Amino acid sequence: MKRGELYRVRRPPGDPKLARVFVIASRQPLIDSTFSTVVCAPVFTQYHGLPTQVSVGTAEGLKHESAIQCDGLMSLEKSRLTDYVGELTFDKLRELDDALLVALALPARKQASI
């Protein structure tokens, strides 16, 4: 299990859908620990171009063009993340990082000077 992997979760808590895809947003040391939950962001089929959304699609293993919704973070039991869908590329992980910064109102990362 790695940060940036997408999993289909059956009957997510508080969600009317029978299944929803989530991407793991937690840092890798937490994922590798004995802690039972990880922070995940849900994936929805609608993309509105918000700075808290990341567009994803067939390249990430999904059937349709969709969007990671960083405003809807949830803590999910690792044991529920069993139906692997795909994973984000390095560039998509960077987009996820940027969207999480906006969603959590964190200061922007400083650019490295050359």
Model-found features: residue ranges?
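Conserved functional hotspots at enzyme active or ligand-binding sites that engage polyanionic ligands
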Residues: 1-114
